[in-house]
Structures are given as structure tokens and as C-alpha cells.
Amino acid sequence: MGTLTASLVAPSKLNPEKHSSLFVYKTRRKSHKNQSIVPVARLFGPAIFEASKLKVLFLGVDEKKHPGKLPRTYTLTHSDITSKLTLAISQTINNSQLQGWYNRLQRDEVVAEWKKVKGKMSLHVHCHISGGHFMLDLFARLRYYIFCKELPVVLKAFVHGDENLLKNYPELQQALVWVYFHSNIQEFNKVECWGPLKDAASPSSSGVGGGMNTSFTSNSNIKWILPKPCEETCTCCFPPMSVIPWPSTTNVENGTIQQGLQEQQS
């Protein structure tokens, strides 16, 4: 993921190598003395995954196989300095990736966990849209759009980084992807179902997120039910509680889930 807020620095201090992958900057000269910075989101064209820019860390988990009784989570962060992605695969969220004032300011990390609910595996992905400081609130709509646009890249990073696991358990490619958008603004505080992982990780032809194939999006009446674990102790649900410490504040009306951005625009 790239930076989701514009850097407030003078044009002379902008280093092309430190530009976010999601924003480009243009300088517009109004006079010899005054210049303004115009952040232009790179909103057009497909999001592209580059394997050479992904660093994968396995922390306390098996690279190829995964015991059914151990959680498996993904923590993905982006560096504006190196333009590289770091993916930690572990039993819990890798908090060391999220430390520092810069990460707390940008909040462009994506975290996810595998869950088994009533015998079915699904991938639950969390994104922070707004809340915490005014800059995030100011750019909430843009952040939501960019997260949606870039999520196929994020999911592709998960698939590529954990490819040995998916080779050993190919059925995970059919697991549904649930995306939780966390925001203090009701419009963006919601859950979306992005369909099977193999489709959600593929950019749509329009370049917009929600990379579901035609067979998935053709029926606009499809309603997905967010899987809920059994209330009593069982063997068909794991883990019993989410290992991601974000509050469950997303809006779910009547137990149904909104579909991805591509579906909304079709």
C-alpha cells in the first residue's frame, strides 16, 4: 500500500524516490515567488503487483504447512522510502511493523487473518479508513477509494508471499474474502464481501478494486452472510475469537454484506 495522505512539504524537498506509489505530485507555478503543490491521486489504470518489491517474513509459522489449531495472520506495510512492501506471516499481528509516529500518522497498513467458521475457511481483511486524527478524517473518501483500488495488489501479495501454503491447500483459493473498513464516518464503516480469493486478488478490467470475475458480479441480487462462529465450544470454528485487536464497529444491516466496489459500479 502506498501513502494515503499527501505529504505537506515544500516542492524543493520532494524526492522522486520517496514518492508514494499512490500519489504523484505536480508543481504549478503561479508566480516567480509562489508555488503550490497539487497531490494527484493515481486513480486511473490497474493496480499492479510487483513481486520484486515484496519482502516476506515468516514469524513463528511454517512456510509450507499450517497446523489447524494455530492462527495465521498477515501484516502488510509499505515504505515510502524504498517503495517496497513488507509482509509478515505469523500467529498474531506483527506490531513491530506498526510502530513509530509515521506509521501511526499514515495508517496505510493492511492486516488479515484466516478463520474457519462452521467448517469453512475465509480470509478476513482489515483497513483503517479514518479516525485517530483529523488528516485521516479529511481524506476518508479518498482513502476508501484507494484502499479499494489497491486491495487486489494486497491480496496478490498475500497469495504470492504464502504461495507454498496455498499450493498445499489449494481449496483456500476458493475461500471468501471479507473486507472490514474501519472508520468513524458511518458511510465508510462497513464490511464488504469480495468473493473467492482467486478472483478478489485479480484486478478488474476497469482498474477498480473489488476484483471479482463476471460470474460473481453478474447476479446483483447475491447477498452474502457474514459467517458467525458457533456460540458454544466446537471443533468447526477456529480461532474462537479474532486475533486482530480492532473493534467490531462495522455496519452490517440485517445480517447482509455489501459487495465490492466493482459490483456497486456495475
From Swiss-Prot:
Gene expressing this chain: SGR
Primary subcellular site in the record, as a coarse category: plastid
Signal peptide region: none
UniProt superkingdom: Eukaryota
GO BP, sorted A to Z: chlorophyll catabolic process
Pfam families documented for this protein: Staygreen (PF12638)
Function of the molecule: Required to trigger chlorophyll degradation during leaf senescence and fruit ripening.
Transit peptide: 1-50
Family according to the record: Belongs to the staygreen family.
This protein's name: Protein STAY-GREEN homolog, chloroplastic
Originating species: Capsicum annuum (Capsicum pepper)
Membrane-traversing stretches: none
Subcellular location: Plastid, Chloroplast
Alphabetized UniProt keyword annotations: Chloroplast, Plastid, Transit peptide
Example of a GO cellular component annotation carried by this entry: chloroplast
InterPro entries: Staygreen
